[in-house]
Amino acid sequence: MSFDPNLLHNNGHNGYPNGTSAALRETGVIEKLLTSYGFIQCSERQARLFFHCSQYNGNLQDLKVGDDVEFEVSSDRRTGKPIAIKLVKIKPEIHPEERMNGQVVCAVPHNLESKSPAAPGQSPTGSVCYERNGEVFYLTYTSEDVEGNVQLETGDKINFVIDNNKHTGAVSARNIMLLKKKQARYQGVVCAMKEAFGFIERGDVVKEIFFHYSEFKGDLETLQPGDDVEFTIKDRNGKEVATDVRLLPQGTVIFEDISIEHFEGTVTKVIPKVPSKNQNDPLPGRIKVDFVIPKELPFGDKDTKSKVTLLEGDHVRFNISTDRRDKLERATNIEVLSNTFQFTNEAREMGVIAAMRDGFGFIKCVDRDARMFFHFSEILDGNQLHIADEVEFTVVPDMLSAQRNHAIRIKKLPKGTVSFHSHSDHRFLGTVEKEATFSNPKTTSPNKGKDKEAEDGIIAYDDCGVKLTIAFQAKDVEGSTSPQIGDKVEFSISDKQRPGQQIATCVRLLGRNSNSKRLLGYVATLKDNFGFIETANHDKEIFFHYSEFSGDVDSLELGDMVEYSLSKGKGNKVSAEKVNKTHSVNGITEEANPTIYSGKVIRPLRGVDPTQIEYQGMIEIVEEGDMKGEVYPFGIVGMANKGDCLQKGESVKFQLCVLGQNAQTMAYNITPLRRATVECVKDQFGFINYEVGDSKKLFFHVKEVQDGIELQAGDEVEFSVILNQRTGKCSACNVWRVCEGPKAVAAPRPDRLVNRLKNITLDDASAPRLMVLRQPRGPDNSMGFGAERKIRQAGVID
């Protein structure tokens, strides 16, 4: 619209179109205000009039939308449309103010830079609410309606006056006063919990805040470190504390944004295994990244994907984490790249997995004699290792013990990569000059040092007329028997991967030294595939395997005299070999003392109680006399019945005899004194009231009862106890009846059985009744069935 102010003169317009000269003034409200013109909404009639800013009598800067004005109406000379002229701003009427209490529902936006700017003369609005008679009413307001330099926030408590625009009828809030700021709620994650208090890592700033358990609104038993919470901050004794702590759904609080893209870099500083006392940096590690502008990113001990040791120079892949609170960037999800060993200065070694335990294992090294300890956490690429897997690793000193090494950064290799020896197919013959020994077998734990190191043996051999010697290890011996000094052996020569070292491998025993000493002993124990021999001095037992016995093993019995040689097997354990049965008499004097003594077993043989250390049993004389209380040892030879199982506390009778090469006086011809009653007899077996070990009853088979007597419950018997060496269970043998027990009297049939049928009543008279036709007779006077059972043809009736 174009407008010429010069058209407004006495001849250019009049008050109304009818030409009346009286100038009537009207009132209205500024509805729209632009740079040079605006529009007025008339109060007395439905009309919207144009006005030019030059027609305003006053400072145009004070005029704003919503102001009441008084004006005259004229007409545009060119268009004939009514326009407002001679505008005067009307002072607002003073009304009695009723102030209301309410709160901010939606605050006026503080920053409108990102939004389209408001039109000139228009202000952004917010909303408030108040309650009256149980109803809630909402009003708009602008920042100009707020008293004082106060920035209102949603939730603030306020006091205001309700303003009713008489021209537009719009209701709004004005003269707004702030009563109480809303308490801010903060979020965070519980990072530590003590006995009565804890700490929360705040989500708005990089800081921890204290809270007492009494401030937690919920079940304290469910609160754990890592839970998301919200809280209010209050000042107590000059320190900020968290109050009104409440749980939030898991995942509500997010501290950082992790990049989707992966980056690669080089480790320039590793995290020390043992942090120094003055180290305060929570992210001590550094990774150099080759961006357009190279930069170093920090990382902490929780930023690696695995617990594999990082070394300086490692090539790694990672994500970048950006903290939302302070925009700090760090490397996270760090994993070692497979080609990293091309860039580090570490010396890599190879070996084979030799043993696996719970969380750790041992590697048999190519370049070292000792097995190398390792933790499962040091396995690269998340591979699952098994015994005999070939691996590559780095050896570093243990941080806790400088004398020990362990393997780190273990990488699985393809089968066939690792080779310990390169040996020829040629076999050599030689004689053992020094025996090889194993290390102490109790060194499987990584926390225990070795008590005794393994020692190499020496073999003398002849090569093209030249007498030479070569070392061999006990682990390279084939079979279960270790060669001894003077034994003939066959072996191969192997070059180790360590240069200049040769060792005998695949050592096989060909023959024992013919001059080796032969020993005598007595069979003390027989198991499934092995046994024990009592030495000639009757004070020890020697292990032997049935494969070392020359003859039929089934012919061996307890107490048999045998001849054998001693050898050292794996683990430096002594065992008997070349065991032969012999009938020579050795070790027992011609005459035993004829006096028979009564005694009590105070310690059984080790075969009866494997938990005891000593092999020999001990018997104490209990009969009155000068020898009462004296104690004598005994072995398997001293038993009258070699299969008898003497237990601690049993009464025995015995003689004394000088036995063994050291002429020791021992108990001999020992016979137990056992009496007990028969508990019950079944078909082919029974039980005796006699306690053996954990069992209260002793089993016996009827074939063990002497003279073919049929035992009855209550009979008193004498017997021997034998121990089944294979099953470990005891049973009675050689059972003699000493006296007969009381006869069992047949009890009459109970009346309840005789009268049962008589007591049956049936309420239904038509129901079938059971009637006794004849009384049954006993088997001695039985009539039985008169009709003989015959084979009948189906379908044919006689």
From Swiss-Prot:
GO CC, sorted alphabetically, is: CRD-mediated mRNA stability complex; cytoplasmic stress granule; cytosol; mCRD-mediated mRNA stability complex; P-body
Q: Can you give the residue ranges of the SUZ-C domain?
A: 748-789
| PROSITE patterns, A to Z | CSD_1, CSD_2, SUZ_C
Identify residues that carry Phosphothreonine.
T761
Q: Which residues form the CSD domain?
A: 26-87, 136-179, 186-245, 297-337, 349-410, 447-507, 519-579, 610-670, 674-735
Pfam family for this entry, one: CSDE1
Top-level lineage group: Eukaryota
Provide the GO MF annotations for this entry.
lncRNA binding; RISC complex binding; RNA stem-loop binding
Regions that span the bilayer: none
- InterPro entries linked: CSD (IPR011129), CSD_CS (IPR019844), CSDE1 (IPR056400), CSP_DNA-bd (IPR002059), NA-bd_OB-fold (IPR012340), SUZ-C (IPR024642)
Q: Name where it mostly resides.
A: cytoplasm
Keyword list (alphabetical) reads:
Acetylation, Cytoplasm, Isopeptide bond, Phosphoprotein, Repeat, RNA-binding, Ubl conjugation
Q: Which residues carry this modification: Phosphoserine?
A: S123, S276, S514, S584
Supply the SMART domains for this chain. CSP
The record's Gene Ontology biological-process terms are: CRD-mediated mRNA stabilization; IRES-dependent viral translational initiation; negative regulation of nuclear-transcribed mRNA catabolic process, deadenylation-dependent decay; nuclear-transcribed mRNA catabolic process, no-go decay; positive regulation of cytoplasmic translation; positive regulation of translation; stress granule assembly
Tell me the residues linked by Glycyl lysine isopeptide (Lys-Gly) (interchain with G-Cter in SUMO2).
K91
Q: Where in the cell is it found?
A: Cytoplasm; Cytoplasm, Stress granule; Cytoplasm, P-body
Residues bearing N6-acetyllysine are K81
Give the UniProt family note.
Answer: Belongs to the UNR family.
What quaternary structure, including any partners, is listed in this protein's UniProt entry? Component of a multi subunit autoregulatory ribonucleoprotein complex (ARC), at least composed of IGF2BP1, PABPC1 and CSDE1. Interacts with STRAP. Part of a complex associated with the FOS mCRD domain and consisting of PABPC1, PAIP1, HNRPD and SYNCRIP. The interaction with PABPC1 is direct and RNA-independent. Interacts with EIF4ENIF1/4E-T.
Q: What does this protein do?
A: RNA-binding protein involved in translationally coupled mRNA turnover. Implicated with other RNA-binding proteins in the cytoplasmic deadenylation/translational and decay interplay of the FOS mRNA mediated by the major coding-region determinant of instability (mCRD) domain. Required for efficient formation of stress granules.
Write the protein's name.
Cold shock domain-containing protein E1
Q: Which organism is it from?
A: Rattus norvegicus (Rat)
